[in-house]
Amino acid sequence: MTCGFSRADRSPYHGPVTSTVARDVSGVRTYQVRTYGCQMNVHDSERLAGLLEAAGYRRAAEGAEVADVVVFNTCAVRENADNKLYGNLSHLAPRKRSNPQMQIAVGGCLAQKDREAVLRRAPWVDVVFGTHNIGSLPTLLERARHNKAAQVEIAEALQQFPSSLPSARESAYAAWVSISVGCNNSCTFCIVPSLRGKEVDRSPDDILAEVRSLVADGVLEVTLLGQNVNAYGVSFADPALPRDRGAFARLLRACGEIDGLERVRFTSPHPAEFTDDVIEAMAQTPNVCPALHMPLQSGSDRVLRAMRRSYRAERYLGIIDRVRAAMPHAAITTDLIVGFPGETEEDFAATLDVVRRARFAAAFTFQYSKRPGTPAAELDGQIPKAVVQERYERLVELQESISLQGNQALVGQTVELLVATGEGRKDSATARMSGRARDGRLVHFAADDRVRPGDLVTTVITGAAPHHLIADAGILSHRRTRAGDAHAPAGARAASVSACPPSGRRRPGPTRWMCLMNDDRNHDDPRLGALRTEIEAAERRVAGGIDPGARGFVVSILVFVLLGSFILPHTGDVRGWDVLFGTHDAGAAAVALPSRVFGWLALVFGVGFSTLALVTRRWALAWIALAGTAIAGAAGMLAIWSRQTVPAGHPGPGWGLIVAWITVLVLIYQWARVVWSRTIVQLAAEEQRRRVAAQQQSTTLLDDLPKPEDPAAGT
C-alpha cells in the first residue's frame, strides 16, 4: 500500500518522530502512539488513539518526549522494524524505572508474532496485544495497573473490525476506511497472512455508512484499505451475504454517488485478481482518483513463480495498458523486491526491462529481508548483501530517471491540489506549502496566507524532480473547505494577530512584514504579493551567487573602467589609452612607467575579475575586483602626485581609483541587500514553522505517514 512520491518512500521505516509530556496539567493521564509500517497500521493506530481517549486519556502535548502511556503499534515485515522497536523500548527503560506509574504497551504484527519474546527482551513492558484484539487495550492497561503485572493477550481470530471502534483521526481532510482484514494469498516472502489471518470483508452497507459519516465530518478524501482490495466480496463477515466477485467495482461506483466526497483512493490490489470492471469503475466514477498502486515485486516470471505470485510479467503489463487506455493520465506506482533468493542477473535484467516498459510514476523498492517463519527464508540461493545493494542502486537509478522524465512532462499543466500538512519536509525553510494532485503526486507550491490544509487549490506546474513537482507561479483558484476550517479554528492564531498600518506604497521592513503575514485580516493586502516576490529573490541571494540586479551593477563597473581607461578625453588630444600605453608624447611625458603599470593593474582587476564574477556568479571574484582596482588605482594616483608630472586637469590612472570607489559603494549596497535577504528568509521560515505548529491537530507519532508499506506487508 502506498501514496506519495517522495525519495524517502523507498524505505518507509525511518523510526517514529517522537512527541512529548507526561501528566496533563488537569491531572488526566496522557498517551502517545508510535506507529511502524503500513497504512493498515496507521489506520489501527487511529483506532487505538480513539479507544484511549474514550477511556479518559488525553493525547500528549506536542513536543513531549514521553507520556503516561506509550503504545507501540509494530510491523513484522522487515528485520529493521524489530531492531527499531527494541531500541526504542531500551530507551524508555530508564524512564520506566524512574516513573513506575508509566505504562508501555506493544501491539501490532510483531507482538502477534513474538508474544513471548517481547517480555523476554523487554521485561519492563506492561501490555502485549495482537492484531485481532486492539479493542482490548484500555482494559489490559487497567488490569496491568491493578495487578502490577504484565498482561499478554493475543487473539487468534478477528474479534471486531477496527473500523467499528472509536477513532482519533490524524487528518481533518483525509481518512482511511478498512474494507477487509487479512489475506488469502500465500506469497513466500510474506508473513502478514499468518499474523492478520484469512481475509474477512465488511459489508458494503457498513463501509458506505462510515464513508458518509466521514464526509459529514468534513472529510474530502477516503482511502479504501485492504491487503487485497480487488478480492473484496469473496469472504464477507456476514454469512448472509453471497460471494460477489464484482463487489469492489460496485463499491467504487457507490462511493462516487456520495455528495461531498471529492476523492476516492484504494490500496492495494493484486494483479492476479485485477479485473476490467474495476478499470471501468475507475474511469467512469469522477471522484475516483486516476492513480493505481499495484505491486509487481519482480519482472522475472521465474522469480514470480518462486514467490507464489499467481501472475506473470506480461499479464501485469497488459493490465497497465488497459488502465492507461481508459485513463491516459493515470499515475501508476508499484512495489519491487531486489535480491529474492535465487534471483540471477538475468532475472534482475527482466525486472529492469519491465520497469522500462511500464514507465512507473514511482516504484517503492526494497531489498529482500529474510523473515523467520516464511517459506522464502528456507530457500536456497540467498543473495549476498553486496550483490543485492548493487542491484538495488541500479534499479533506483533507472526508476528515478523515468520518474523525472514523467514529472518533467507535466511542467506547464494545471493541477488541482488537496493541501496537506506535514508532507513537505522543507516547507518551513522554503516558505512553501504542499499538496497532493488527484493522481497522488506531491506538489510544493508558493505559500499563501489564505490557504489552509484541507483546502483545494489549482496551480500550474513550473518545475519537476523525481519525487515531487514545484508550482511557483501562484495560485489560480482557491476553494475553502470545512476541513480547512478544522485545521484553522477561529481564534487559533489570535495571539499572533496585530494591527498593521493600512496599505500604502511604502515597502514594509521586517517588522511590518511579520505584521502583514501574521494578520489574517490582511489576506487581500496587495503588499503581500510584492513581499512574496521579495522572499523568492532573497532566497536566491542568500543561496549564493550574483542575482540579476547585482549583475547589472557589476556591468556598470566594466563600463566605468572602459570609459575611464580608453574613451574619455583628458587634456587636449591626450586620451585614456595614451596614458596607459604611453603612445602619445603628451601621455608618455605625463605618466612615468610605474604609473602606467599601476594603471594597467587597475584595468586588469576592474575588467578581468568583474568579468569573471559575471561568468561564474562568484562574489569572491567581485571582492577581488574591488580590492585590486582600489589598490592599483590608489597607487597610480600616488605615483603621479609624487612625481608632480600630471598635466593640469589630467586625472590619468586616477580613473582606477574612481572605479574602485564606485565598486566599494556597489558592493556595500549588495552586502546590505544580502543582510536584508537573510532577515526576510529567516522571518519567512519562522512564520512558516509557526503556521505548521498552529495547524497540527494531533501528536500521535507516525513513523511514515503517508509512506508505502513494505511489499511483504501487502500484495
UniProtKB/Swiss-Prot annotation:
Transport as UniProt keyword: no
Primary location recorded for the protein, binned into one broad class: membrane
Organism: Mycobacterium avium (strain 104)
TM annotation in the entry: 552-572, 589-609, 621-641, 652-672
Record SUPFAM superfamilies: Radical SAM enzymes
EC number: 2.8.4.3
All residue ranges annotated as the MTTase N-terminal domain in the record: 29-146
Xref: PANTHER family: CDK5 REGULATORY SUBUNIT-ASSOCIATED PROTEIN 1, MITOCHONDRIAL TRNA METHYLTHIOTRANSFERASE CDK5RAP1
Protein's recorded name: tRNA-2-methylthio-N(6)-dimethylallyladenosine synthase
Cofactor entry: [4Fe-4S] cluster
Amino acids binding [4Fe-4S] cluster 2: C183, C187, C190
NCBIfam families: miaB-methiolase, MiaB/RimO family radical SAM methylthiotransferase
Lineage start: Bacteria, Bacillati, Actinomycetota, Actinomycetes, Mycobacteriales
Chain's gene name: miaB
